[in-house]
């Protein structure tokens, strides 16, 4: 069977051009004193809905930390740029993101975290909301300075306060939102050399689905893969293919990780690829 290639983007956030999902600006809430007082000691077997405290950690980059016994944390509502690795240079503002996280957690006796419902990412890292020793939202600190993109690794989506703080940072051209860095790429002109985390836009051409995912085809050779549960939540509340097919011909702006996948014709028709 003849095989072809297609870009597949694991979408973590997207919007229709002109779709208004705005909310009034709000500061992200701090962790309450009662939550900090009642926080459980991290044991490596966390439960969703509980608050945990950690007394020893190592900042690995702007959105991840290492804990004793090999446990790893990933901030589940943001993404910072990549540090230098395996001969590849650091991306813009990667070091600043790591430095900001390090500075905020420095001289803290304890930090607090809450597990996201998704629990872990595909690298085995615990997905968490992170607070410093004073109960301040660590992700918000990075977003407000333009050092992180808001994403959603959970079907319930990232906190609205983070989206609003990102909007302000973007309007002020802070950090990653400088024009030369934050350009949205066009799906129609992607090449096989491009990949990784990016912001992308393109006109919708087709819709397909699997048991748990929607696949939104864009002009060129791009398919957006997004969990059905994520679209079922507010503000979109999309639960049927008929609803999504109304988007055909409209332009979508999205962000996520892009991979170049080799698919056979049957797979391409259904766009059932794994990222």
Residue ranges of each PLM-predicted region?
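Bacterial N-terminal signal peptides that target proteins for export
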Residues: 1-11
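Bacterial N-terminal signal peptides
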Residues: 10-19
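Small beta-barrel nucleic-acid-binding modules, primarily SNase/OB-fold domains
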Residues: 22-275
């Amino acid at each position: 069977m003849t095989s072809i290639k297609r870009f597949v983007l694991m979408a973590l956030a997207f919007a229709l051009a002109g779709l208004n999902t705005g909310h009034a600006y709000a500061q992200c809430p701090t962790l309450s004193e009662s939550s900090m007082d009642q926080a459980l000691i991290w044991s490596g077997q966390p439960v969703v809905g509980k608050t945990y405290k950690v007394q020893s950690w190592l900042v690995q980059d702007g959105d991840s930390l290492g804990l004793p016994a090999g446990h790893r944390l990933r901030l589940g509502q943001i993404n910072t740029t990549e540090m230098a690795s395996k001969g590849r240079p650091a991306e813009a503002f990667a070091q600043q993101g790591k430095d900001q996280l390090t500075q905020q957690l420095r001289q803290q006796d304890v930090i607090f975290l809450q597990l996201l419902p998704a629990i872990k990412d595909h690298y085995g890292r615990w997905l968490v909301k992170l607070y410093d020793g004073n109960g301040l939202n660590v992700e918000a600190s990075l977003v407000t300075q333009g050092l992180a993109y808001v994403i959603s690794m959970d079907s319930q989506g990232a906190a609205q306060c983070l989206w609003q703080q990102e909007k302000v940072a973007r309007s002020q051209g802070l950090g990653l939102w400088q024009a030369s860095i934050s350009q949205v790429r066009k799906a129609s002109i992607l090449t096989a050399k491009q990949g990784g985390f990016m912001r992308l836009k393109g006109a919708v051409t087709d819709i397909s689905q699997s048991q748990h995912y929607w696949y939104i085809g864009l002009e060129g050779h791009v398919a957006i893969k997004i969990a059905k549960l994520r679209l079922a939540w507010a503000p979109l509340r999309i639960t049927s293919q008929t609803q999504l097919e109304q988007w055909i011909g409209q332009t979508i702006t999205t962000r996520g990780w892009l991979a170049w996948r080799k698919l056979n014709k049957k797979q391409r028709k259904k766009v059932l690829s794994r990222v």
